């Protein structure tokens, strides 16, 4: 009888618990007159409808909000993005970590603002898992800001849209003092891995011209599993167990460029597959397209195969969205790159080329920590303590490297002074699982869970 009751009430219970998906949530819609707002303006805000997720448990933090922010697409057309702001217990209003999660999908319902909420769909599990990477930032007392940088069209791997969204999210956060208590002159570090590195890297490269006023706030950017050439990522993943990434790259670019989409549509052997590319978040794409041949072999999805990249329109679009080709865009803030030599998603050649381009242009500070024994997925874990160490040093006003430094290590667990950050990760993970408060100097009477279940 008990099981029958549970079976009958489960749909009702689930309806109460689950956050609303962006595609049917009116909060994500641009309000009337939004085009007249300035980029970075907060158009509306709310508490996150559900608690921030820790996977199977909610995070115990002080507060969390969603902002609807005025931004723009790759062509300068006005649009809106949603950004999530998380306040830890005993937060430091002078420090912000802008953490770009690796959404790596071309569907609105995969957006970080949705995926970071407790109860979000299992298809967003890869994004949910990144809360364990950002948890130590909260434990240090930093506000964490995470934008839906792909924008309302879900333009995965589209550089300009993504970078501008990150910068406008930071602008909004710095204006949010009356809501969040963040100081207007707060210092900001950007960090992203995989798709999040693409957005963060573009933000750093665009910032001197697009958001020059942020120079007084930005302390640097950490880039892991750094994607700088989208064609190389498609080449590396097509006809492999990671072919879902190739699908999502093509779908994301098609969402921003109608002419790109039209060329793909007219070249397809399997329209049913192409038309469903945007139906999946990353986890689903991996499962759905394992071993898929979009451009390889006889039974490929696109007739032209790799020759499609010789099409002048396609070639220009993919190069316009590859940071490795943008030699005129040079960050003026310190840069930290950590990357596995065995990366299966973003082969290390292109991050190295981007590093060299920036060095040749005279960048003031860039550090490349190459990990000999790890690939894309393992480096996201192994390299994270090195990135955290670098970020803590920047917030502590320690000087970054002068000029360019590329160091190859057996593993980035050998990064200097990394041991304390490794312990920070273990502590934060245990705090998440035990639903302990995330933040510095927490007293026992502050451990009540701030839940929006």
UniProtKB/Swiss-Prot annotation:
Annotated signal sequence is: 1-14
Question: What Pfam families does UniProt report for this protein, alphabetically?
Answer: LIP
| EC number, as in UniProt | 3.1.1.3
Induction or repression: Expression is not induced in medium containing Tween 40 as the sole source of carbon. Expression is up-regulated during the yeast-to-hyphal transition. Expressed during experimental infection of mice. During host infection, expressed in gastric tissues, but not in infected oral tissues.
Name the enzyme group at the top EC level.
hydrolase
User: Where is it located?
Assistant: Secreted
Q: InterPro entries, alphabetically?
A: AB_hydrolase_fold (IPR029058), Lipase_secreted (IPR005152)
Please give the residues the UniProt entry marks as glycosylated. Answer: 36, 229, 266, 269, 417
Q: Name one GO molecular function term.
A: triacylglycerol lipase activity
* Cellular component aspect of the GO annotation: extracellular region
- Main localization category: secreted
| Catalytically driven reaction(s) | a triacylglycerol + H2O = a diacylglycerol + a fatty acid + H(+)
Q: Which domain of life is it from?
A: Eukaryota
Q: Which residue pairs form cystines in this protein?
A: 110-281, 359-404
Keyword line: Disulfide bond, Glycoprotein, Hydrolase, Lipid degradation, Lipid metabolism, Secreted, Signal, Virulence
GO biological processes: lipid catabolic process
* Family listed: Belongs to the AB hydrolase superfamily. Lipase family. Class Lip subfamily.
* Function comment: Secreted lipase that is able to hydrolyze both the neutral triacylglycerols and the monopalmitate ester Tween 40, allowing the use of hydrolyzed products as carbon sources. Has broad lipolytic activity, which may be important for colonization and subsequent infection, therefore contributing to the persistence and virulence in human tissue.
Q: What is this protein called?
A: Lipase 9
């Amino acid at each position: 009888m008990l099981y029958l009751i549970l079976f009958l009430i489960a749909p009702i219970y689930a309806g109460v618990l689950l956050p609303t998906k962006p595609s049917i949530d009116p909060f994500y819609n641009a309000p009337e007159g939004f085009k007249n707002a300035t980029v970075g303006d907060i158009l509306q805000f709310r508490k996150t409808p559900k608690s921030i997720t820790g996977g199977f448990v909610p995070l115990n933090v002080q507060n969390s909000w969603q902002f609807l922010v005025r931004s723009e697409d790759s062509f300068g057309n006005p649009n809106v993005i949603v950004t999530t702001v998380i306040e830890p217990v005993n937060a430091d209003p002078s420090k912000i970590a802008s953490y770009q999660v690796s959404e790596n999908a071309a569907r609105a319902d995969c957006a970080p603002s949705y995926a970071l909420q407790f109860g979000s769909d299992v298809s967003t599990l890869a994004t949910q898992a990144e809360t364990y990477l950002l948890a130590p930032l909260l434990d240090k007392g930093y506000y964490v800001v995470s934008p839906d940088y792909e924008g309302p069209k879900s333009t995965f791997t589209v550089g300009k849209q993504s970078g501008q969204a990150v910068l406008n999210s930071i602008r909004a956060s710095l204006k949010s003092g009356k809501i969040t208590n963040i100081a207007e002159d707060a210092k900001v570090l950007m960090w992203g891995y995989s798709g999040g590195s693409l957005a963060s890297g573009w933000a750093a490269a665009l910032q001197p011209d697009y958001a020059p006023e942020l120079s007084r706030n930005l302390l640097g950017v950490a880039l892991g599993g750094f994607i700088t050439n989208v064609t190389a990522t498609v080449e590396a993943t097509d006809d492999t167990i990671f072919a879902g990434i190739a699908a999502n790259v093509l779908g994301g670019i098609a969402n921003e460029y109608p002419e790109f989409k039209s060329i793909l549509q007219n070249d397809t052997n399997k329209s049913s597959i192409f038309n469903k590319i945007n139906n999946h978040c990353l986890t689903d794409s991996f499962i759905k397209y394992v071993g898929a041949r979009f451009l390889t072999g006889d039974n490929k999805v696109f007739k032209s195969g790799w020759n499609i990249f010789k099409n002048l329109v396609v070639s220009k679009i993919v190069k316009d969205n590859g940071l490795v080709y943008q030699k005129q865009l040079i960050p003026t803030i310190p840069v930290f790159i950590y990357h596995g030599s065995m990366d299966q998603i973003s082969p290390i050649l292109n991050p190295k080329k981007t590093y060299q381009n920036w060095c040749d242009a005279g960048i003031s500070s860039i550090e490349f920590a190459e990990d000999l024994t790890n690939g894309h997925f393992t480096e996201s874990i192994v390299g994270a303590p090195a990135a955290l160490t670098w970020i803590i040093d920047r917030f502590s006003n320690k000087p970054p490297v002068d000029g360019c430094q590329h160091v190859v290590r057996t593993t980035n667990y050998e990064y200097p002074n990394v041991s304390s950050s490794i312990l920070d990760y273990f502590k934060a993970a245990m705090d998440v699982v035990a639903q302990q408060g995330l933040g510095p100097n927490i007293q026992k009477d502050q451990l009540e869970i701030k839940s929006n279940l």
